[in-house]
Amino acid sequence: MTLASESLPLSGLKVLSVEFYGAGPFCTQYLSTFGADVIKIENSTQGGDFARTTGPNSLGPEDSLYFQSFNQGKRSLSLDLKDKKGKEVLHRLVAKSDVITNNLRGDKPEQLGLTYSVLKEVNPKIVCTHLS
């Protein structure tokens, strides 16, 4: 973290985001801009966020300007959240995070264990948000 980023309002906030295309990346782009440390969790079984291949692709076939615009300043990790090992990695990250957010459709957060009722067992202080 640089001296400049330490003075931003969300400096020190650790955010996990299970997100793809649209509202999720747009939301966490702002969190990152204001100093939050954002880790984008992408689905390893589907090749990550499909926005990677959304045009224009002037940077390369899987390096979309759209994707780069909404994901600048974030780190990313590819996990299978249906797999036991993927869940273990997610839980280790949740234990060290302040916020987890997602923009998955209605029943997916519950299916993947991304609700407060599940994650409070790992980190009772975690803030869970769901974008729709």
Where are these regions (language model features)?
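N-terminal helix-loop segment corresponding to the beta1-alpha1 unit
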Residues: 1-132
